[in-house]
Amino acid sequence: MSRKEVSFMEDKVFVSIFATYMDLWVEDRKAHGFQCKSAIGNLRQIDMYIASNPPQGSIDQSYYEGWLDSVRVPEASTKAVYSKAATFRQFLKFLKALGINDFIPRLPRCKDNFFVPYIFSHEEIQAIFQAIDSTAIRSEFNRTSLMSMPVLFRLLYSTGMRVGEAVSICNKDVDFQHHVILIEESKNRHQRICPINKSLQEVLQGYIRYRNMLPTKKVSLPDSPLLVNRCGHSLNINTVERWFRESLRKAGIPYRGHFAGPRIHDLRHTACVHAMIKLVGEGMDLYCSLPVLSKFLGHLDAYSTERYLRLTQEVYPDIINKVNLSLPEIKAIVERTSKTEHWHEDN
């Protein structure tokens, strides 16, 4: 290899046969507001392994396990191995969404990073809303994102969408006539429609009227972001997280740390569990509710949604035990999901 070729290889972040898709995945993550430094580091290690050990065809269970063995070196912590495996899994889900590769692995066990999503009670949800509603802007000239937080928190809880999806919504994606929001920037790269109820629609319309008074002409354009800071710029997820933690503090809900939560993503988990309880309360068979919830959350398959059944049993055991836990299908799902990987941001 010539010196020029070596220099070219060193300048490229990814060099394997999946380099183009890795670049696209990183761009997609950044577009959703995620910090990618750690993920890029993990992906480069995966890329080097693939470059040195090209798969014979697609990436399957056997190939993945070979890679996993290569990172399970004595000096590697279980947390580090889990982080790399999570990145690989996210990338493989991206490939599946593109129709490139079908295999999606389960994550390894990680004692250092175990957590169960925090499910807020209905009272805690109302306390969070009241806390963010009562938070005042400290300076008239502040570039704060606070003006969007009350509607964002309600949007996440009402629709169950991911925060990355919410901050990517454009004005043109909101259809008040049909009471829906179109999600173009889905995590799984699948377009989906989120229904909005009457109360959320009223909140959104009130926010838009206030937002359109900002001294910027672009804020109301169809392709401009729906949720903005006072300068008319789109929201940063890290800023959203900070406002959420502040709301937890004001609501008297202890923040126990990043992996212990509660996190902004737990509004999505809570939305699903509360929706499941509502469907059961309205008489829907619990087993039949899973496909409905899968569509609601934008999951590619029902497997990810099944884990909410176990979580609902843990949080609301009386309700679940009273209805359908006696059914063999429900028992099988609860037992299966209790033995699988830990919760992750994929959900």
Regions found by a protein language model. Give the residues of each.
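Conserved catalytic core of the tyrosine transesterase superfamily
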Residues: 2-347
